[in-house]
């Protein structure tokens, strides 16, 4: 079960929810960049809580920073989205990394990052600003070709800074990112010489792993993606994986 930690980012207290495996460790770790529905509070989002527990059960200390700490949780999502800035998001992700890196149960040389939806974009962005990350997983991350606020260039334009292998998982019925967007992601990673693997699922829309959204959830695609994520993370974050 995840526990709440508090770190301070630019004078603002940010919740970081952390789930850990049983035992003494040290364990590999993951930063989970949250999806948009978690803006009401990680404790109120069943999908994010499930992810934290799922990865802890697989042997990872998993930390989800609450990137919307600048606003009251009851503030409308449109207000929060309009105020997000990439430079702040990078600081939030780096604060979560520092929290994990400072834990005795974490092997600081085996930390990865992943995210769904807007979290996929944030994970890509964060990887471009942290050369200690060892794995990046992007699940249907949209708007990677656009900046956020006045906080810097679009994540796609920073692809050459990604320090680690990348796994991407996308639905071919999604429009954000669309298949054409995913083509552009691939082109940017190829041009930058990044080690990446993308999988695309036919008959699959955005948010296909989110069981709390039955209109989008696709069990077959989700199950296949879980297995691909498991293998990828084991290969890059687990000795002998």
Please provide the spans of the model-predicted regions.
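Conserved alpha/beta-hydrolase "acid-adjacent" motif
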Residues: 175-181
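Short beta-strand/loop motif that positions the catalytic acidic residue
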Residues: 162, 168-170
């Amino acid at each position: 079960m995840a526990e709440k930690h508090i770190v301070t980012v630019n004078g603002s207290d940010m919740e970081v929810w952390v789930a850990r495996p049983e035992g003494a460790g040290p364990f590999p770790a993951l930063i989970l960049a949250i999806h948009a529905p978690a803006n009401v509070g990680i404790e109120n989002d069943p999908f994010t809580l499930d992810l934290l527990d799922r990865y802890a059960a697989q042997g990872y200390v998993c930390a989800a920073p609450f990137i919307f700490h600048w606003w009251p949780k009851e503030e409308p999502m449109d207000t929060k989205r309009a105020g997000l800035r990439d430079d702040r998001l990078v600081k939030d992700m780096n604060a979560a990394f520092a929290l994990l890196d400072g834990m005795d149960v974490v092997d600081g040389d085996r930390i990865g990052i992943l995210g769904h939806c807007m979290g996929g974009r944030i994970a890509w962005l964060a990887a471009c600003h942290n050369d200690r990350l060892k794995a990046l997983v992007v699940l249907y991350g949209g708007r990677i070709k656009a900046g956020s606020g006045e906080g810097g260039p679009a994540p796609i334009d920073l692809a050459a800074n990604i320090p680690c292998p990348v796994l991407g998982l996308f639905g071919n019925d999604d429009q954000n990112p669309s298949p054409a967007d995913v083509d552009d992601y691939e082109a940017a990673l190829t041009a930058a010489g990044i080690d990446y693997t993308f999988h695309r699922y036919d008959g699959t829309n955005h948010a296909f792993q989110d069981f709390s959204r039955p209109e989008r959830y696709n069990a077959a695609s989700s199950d296949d993606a879980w297995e691909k994520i498991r293998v990828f993370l084991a290969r890059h974050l687990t000795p002998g994986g």
